[in-house]
Amino acid sequence: MISTFALFWALCIVCIINMARYYSSLRVLLMILRDCDPLLYQYVDGGGFFTSHGQPSKQIRLVGYIYAQRYLDHHDPEFIRRCERVRGQFLLTTALCGLIVISLIAMMMWY
């Protein structure tokens, strides 16, 4: 029989790996954004996005921009492709984090 704790930790490791992939894809997206749309890059604070003085409201703007699929009208196909990839990874990571929370609650109730 598979251990519940082993399964939970495996799920956590998969989630952490997907978070790292999401972070990496977001960095590449910002590099592409700097070249193809400097105004949007400034609008989402691309230069300070991953720094300690980054502005969360501007970071949320980029997440909202990608989540609402407003990138579909953009002129650069590479940017559109990267946004679709980041959106997919964001949805996957969100679902995995939700599954971890549900699993943690279930384990606390079970044990």
UniProtKB/Swiss-Prot annotation:
Membrane topology annotation: Multi-pass membrane protein
Q: Where are the transmembrane segments?
A: 1-21, 90-110
Where it sits in the cell: the answer is: Cell inner membrane
Q: Which InterPro entries match?
A: Universal_stress_protein_B
State whether keyword Repeat applies. Answer: no
Which UniProt keywords are given for this protein, alphabetically ordered?
Cell inner membrane, Cell membrane, Membrane, Transmembrane, Transmembrane helix
Please verify whether the record's keywords include Membrane: yes
GO terms under cellular component: plasma membrane
Predominant place of localization: membrane
Report the coiled-coil segments.
Answer: none
Q: Which family does it belong to?
A: Belongs to the universal stress protein B family.
Q: What is this protein called?
A: Universal stress protein B
